């Protein structure tokens, strides 16, 4: 009964409306001031603890396609070496199967944009692809094999977010072959995986459920029920409804592409665990500022809202 009385009085204090649970007594005002005092002490202590030891996780900063500020050709060893110097938490990159069942690092379904060749990665062998020149941002280099890219990332101690891109031209054993060849190394060096194809997610989880694997959702329509480690979403489609649903699970959230302070603020507000960006230095700077100069009132308000589940 004492706890009930305390809670009712606390709500009355916050709302300004009296909630009667028993006939008023002359000493009620003493209890009211006691409740106010306890509440003040509680929030002061809670606020101090929050500011001294914030319970929010620092989001991972992730390079989009292995580049930052157009520092090279996307998805190449050449750019990886430059981008790794900026020390991102992860480098997101794309992998596709070749005609001869090997793997290259390539985002586009067609080589026309980067290589000026009207062909898909699945139309050419690994040797043909790795001898093909590609151009972007004023740079020129060769298409990188996944073997070379992975080996260089490991040497640089750079963790990857490996996106598997599938196509109708892929071999039926594509994922089995990929995991048999690279799965142990991916786990050993702490790399992560993601895909728009849930078949890939299933294959990775069946191979080793300890390898983090994210399901990419291009649109926010219906909240999925999957066994994925988490979801990768385009930040502009993300909303409170999705995040509230996500909080009922143990899954995480990555967002792309965070290239402005506005998109950064939204990603932070919605509790993103990772931010994929074309501008590593901007996002890293924003993260540092958020850590070093927290706004006292904003933090207390956030904690109060979380406490009362507003």
Where are these regions (language model features)?
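Phosphate-group recognition and catalysis centered on beta-loop-alpha active-site segments
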Residues: 1-310
């Amino acid at each position: 009964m004492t706890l009930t009385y305390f809670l009712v009085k606390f709500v009355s204090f916050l709302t300004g409306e009296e909630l009667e649970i028993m006939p008023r007594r002359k000493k009620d005002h003493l209890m009211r001031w006691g409740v106010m005092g306890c509440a003040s002490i509680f929030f002061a202590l809670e606020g101090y603890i929050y500011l001294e030891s914030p319970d929010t996780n620092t989001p991972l900063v992730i390079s989009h396609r292995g580049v930052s500020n157009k520092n090279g050709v996307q998805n190449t060893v050449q750019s990886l070496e430059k981008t790794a110097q900026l020390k991102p938490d992860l480098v997101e990159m794309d992998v596709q199967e070749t005609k001869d069942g090997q793997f290259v690092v390539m985002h586009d379904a067609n080589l026309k944009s980067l290589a000026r060749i009207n062909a898909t990665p699945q139309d050419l062998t690994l040797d043909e692809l790795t001898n093909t020149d590609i151009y972007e941002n004023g740079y020129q280099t060769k298409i990188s094999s996944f073997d070379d890219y992975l080996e260089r990332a490991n040497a640089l101690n750079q963790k990857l977010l490996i996106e598997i891109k599938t196509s109708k031209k892929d071999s039926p054993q594509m994922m089995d072959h990929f995991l048999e060849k690279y799965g142990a190394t991916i786990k050993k060096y702490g790399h992560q995986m993601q895909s728009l194809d849930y078949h890939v997610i299933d294959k990775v989880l069946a191979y080793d459920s300890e390898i983090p694997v994210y399901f990419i959702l291009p649109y926010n329509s219906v909240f999925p029920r999957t066994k994925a480690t988490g979801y990768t979403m385009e930040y502009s489609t993300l909303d409170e409804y999705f995040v509230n649903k996500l909080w009922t699970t143990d899954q995480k959230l990555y967002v792309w592409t965070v290239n402005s302070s506005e998109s950064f603020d939204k990603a932070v507000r919605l509790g993103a665990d990772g931010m994929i960006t074309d501008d590593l230095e901007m996002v890293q700077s924003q993260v540092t500022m958020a850590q070093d100069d927290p706004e006292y009132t904003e933090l207390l308000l956030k904690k109060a809202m979380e406490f009362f589940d507003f």
